[in-house]
Amino acid sequence: MELFKDIKNLGKLVRLERIFNRESEKTVIVPMDHGVSNGPIKGLIDIRKTVNDVAEGGANAVLLHKGIVRHGHRGYGKDVGLIIHLSGGTAISPNPLKKVIVTTVEEAIRMGADAVSIHVNVGSDEDWEAYRDLGMIAETCEYWGMPLIAMMYPRGKHIQNERDPELVAHAARLGAELGADIVKTSYTGDIDSFRDVVKGCPAPVVVAGGPKTNTDEEFLQMIKDAMEAGAAGVAVGRNIFQHDDVVGITRAVCKIVHENADVEEALKEIRKK
């Protein structure tokens, strides 16, 4: 794929084609790692059903913690890529922004992963530990031919606006600088500023879904704008798995990401009954 022309590692290229659409060269990832940070929230109670629904809706990959893979594995129907999340931290911790490494690239390989991901809160206390982890894991991923997704967010007690374009651009660039193959980060709120984020990051950028939005139109417009700005895809959790029509909203997102549909056209996928 042209998107990954700078990657020469065959193992990475083979795996990346399992989580990206070969024709559009874009991806729709549904993270479901929230159980560690927030517990059994709505949409993640019956993990197998949710995985089934997003797969039927056309998602390219799901992102899970290692212990949930056995409970969410489909074993039938349409295939969906598997991304194992390496980081963990809880909302009830004295330091909820602290993320530690909870598994290895090697274990992810044994579980059949197509990629691994790591979470970095740029600007948080002791964030340097996460930078070290990212750099070392990037080296391991290169050795094994495993694609690495870095979730890079400006977060910390000194960060007043987590969507500040300069901070988001810095966080995204940091992920690429330390070896990530793909960077996931927050949408900055408008096309022009997010385009600058994409331009400043040598690695492909996928946009995070963020908090649950008030309307489908608001959510899908954000996806549309991010794609217009040059995003390589989306990584959306709550706005998909907490939707009343998980299959439909997944189809709507895929319609925009892979077919360049407008919001009104994508909304029709939700209204199908």
From Swiss-Prot:
Keywords: Amino-acid biosynthesis, Aromatic amino acid biosynthesis, Schiff base, Transferase. It is an enzyme of class 2 (transferase). Pfam families: DeoC. Its EC number is 2.2.1.10. It catalyses: 1-deoxy-D-threo-hexo-2,5-diulose 6-phosphate + L-aspartate 4-semialdehyde = 2,3-dioxopropyl phosphate + 2-amino-2,3,7-trideoxy-D-lyxo-hept-6-ulosonate. Gene3D superfamilies: Aldolase class I. GO terms for molecular function: acyltransferase activity, transferring groups other than amino-acyl groups; fructose-bisphosphate aldolase activity; hydro-lyase activity; transketolase or transaldolase activity. The active site is at D33, Y153, K184. InterPro entries: ADH_synthase (IPR010210), Aldolase_TIM (IPR013785), DeoC/FbaB/LacD_aldolase (IPR002915), DeoC/FbaB_aldolase (IPR050456), FbaB-like (IPR041720). 1-deoxy-D-threo-hexo-2,5-diulose 6-phosphate binds at D33, H34, G35, V36, S37, Y153, P154, R155, G209, G210, G237, R238. Inhibited by NaBH4 in the presence of FBP. Optimum temperature is not reached at 100 degrees Celsius. GO terms for biological process: amino acid biosynthetic process; aromatic amino acid family biosynthetic process. CDD domains: DhnA. SMART domains: DeoC. Catalyzes a transaldol reaction between 6-deoxy-5-ketofructose 1-phosphate (DKFP) and L-aspartate semialdehyde (ASA) with an elimination of hydroxypyruvaldehyde phosphate to yield 2-amino-3,7-dideoxy-D-threo-hept-6-ulosonate (ADH). Plays a key role in an alternative pathway of the biosynthesis of 3-dehydroquinate (DHQ), which is involved in the canonical pathway for the biosynthesis of aromatic amino acids. Can also catalyze the cleavage of fructose-1,6-bisphosphate (FBP) to glyceraldehyde-3-phosphate (GAP) and dihydroxyacetone phosphate (DHAP). Belongs to the DeoC/FbaB aldolase family. ADHS subfamily. Homodecamer. This is 2-amino-3,7-dideoxy-D-threo-hept-6-ulosonate synthase. It comes from Methanocaldococcus jannaschii (strain ATCC 43067 / DSM 2661 / JAL-1 / JCM 10045 / NBRC 100440). The gene is aroA'.
